[in-house]
Amino acid sequence: MMDGHVQGLRKPLIPMSHVVGCNLLLYIRLGCREIYVGCVHYQGGFTNVIFYFKCSNEGCIISLAVFPAILPAAYNSHGERIVACCGCNMTVAY
């Protein structure tokens, strides 16, 4: 899992170890870019987040969760939105 040490990110992410549940509100697929927008319950509060997913042999898992109010979108040094590219079927584990 990533802990916020991603090139181009300047704001803190929700530690994945603190996420205890999520509800999928919106799913957007742009080519191989998979973006899920939902509401996550985490230790210490409840907030809207943007989920970024990545693929593994077991399926797709959350790679990043971002506070939109703090970081509306994550961009790399080339100005591209940071999203994971997936080729497998996307599923959300509750």
UniProtKB/Swiss-Prot annotation:
Q: What is the effect of changing V49L?
A: In strain: CEN.PK 113-7D
Q: Which domain of life is it from?
A: Eukaryota
Name of the protein this chain belongs to: Putative uncharacterized protein YIL058W
